[in-house]
Amino acid sequence: MIKAAVTKESLYRMNTLMEAFQGFLGLDLGEFTFKVKPGVFLLTDVKSYLIGDKYDDAFNALIDFVLRNDRDAVEGTETDVSIRLGLSPSDMVVKRQDKTFTFTHGDLEFEVHWINL
């Protein structure tokens, strides 16, 4: 699971954050489901693999979603947001195992739980 408070400053750093995800997890493809609330998003699952480099589109979509919602509102209902990331077939060999990480990037802290598919 990845949990992070979302602020205007962190949104502007999202491209760097995207690169940190890729490098830290050693994971370049998959479908990620975010639980999004005002001010908070949770990466709760890695559902599937697919072809195509989608990092920029995926994180732009996440940023757009958060910006469209009132981040400072009283805690609301969670919303699922599927984010698809991918690489070419030659890059699709990924060693998957149960892991838990803690990762800090700027003022964001991530608890990462990788689950076997």
Swiss-Prot record:
Domain of life where this protein originates: Viruses
Name of the protein in its database record: Putative gene 49 protein
Organism: Bacillus phage SP01
